[in-house]
Amino acid sequence: MENENLKKGILFLVFSAFSFALMGMFVRLAGDIPFMQKAFFRNLVSFAIAFFSLAKEEKTARLQKSKSVFKISGKEFLFLLLRASCGSIGIFGNFYALDHLNIADAAMLNKMSPFFTLLFCFFLLGEKIELIPLLAISTAFAGSLLIIKPSFNLTHFIPSLAGFFSGMGAGFAYACVRKLHSYNTSPSLIITFFSLFSCLISVPFILINPVPMTLKQFLILLGTGLAAAGGQFGITFAYYNAPASKISIFDYSQIIFSAILGFIAFHQIPDIFSFLGYVIIISMAAVVFFYNRRNSRT
């Protein structure tokens, strides 16, 4: 049974990785629509799906006369707000990067999030960081510089920095999710709150600079939202079936999918510096993965 759940966890995580890679391709395919408008549609679809799931949970809770999923403490609301704020920064940064970088580069910078999660869990949850993961984090940051390529060429540097901050925002958001898990907050409530918050943040930017869309662009953005929802729920079911210490490394398959889709759709090929950055970051993720796996057995 444990092996069966492990296989399910891996399959769900690879499905999630492919879905997020597909989302990245759709973001780029949508063309010259402002990234905030793209993010709005991504979050709107996710909100609709998550709210439907949340409504079902609430209905079940009422039938069983158990605690309402909407009944939360002040501390829970604070971490929901922090998760939504930093998650929104993560999405906006990621979408801006996807519009201006190779989609594999943008995906890799966003995948810095697990390293940031380790750091933020230290500050938020008091979780100890061992020497090996700390060295891996430092090396991964060095690897990210090969992708960012700091320079006075703002055309590349600013989108790269946005991609880096997308990983930072996502990392803080995941640390908040860890904290919310300790309060037994409904995952559907977390996703619903975050998606609605991001939608509302996007609205003023869309009103200031509305851009008409063709039917094709609308359908692509609908696909963006569906792919994002698939990725979000895939990762949720993955970690429901198996612990992160045994499957998290498979999340980096998104980089492979992104590179393939980027080549097929846009003829994008990462340069040698980006490729070296990928190798360093994924290698450090593997170091942390196997280190945690070994420690979980002792």
Q: Whereabouts are the PLM-identified features?
A:
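Hydrophobic transmembrane alpha-helices of multi-pass small-molecule transport proteins
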Residues: 132-149, 273-292
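Hydrophobic/small/kink-forming positions within alpha-helical transmembrane segments
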Residues: 17-21, 84-92, 114-119, 144-145, ...
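Transmembrane alpha-helices of multi-pass small-molecule transport proteins
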Residues: 34-89, 169-173, 192-208
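C-terminal transmembrane-helix exit sites in multi-pass transporters
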Residues: 113-135, 256-275
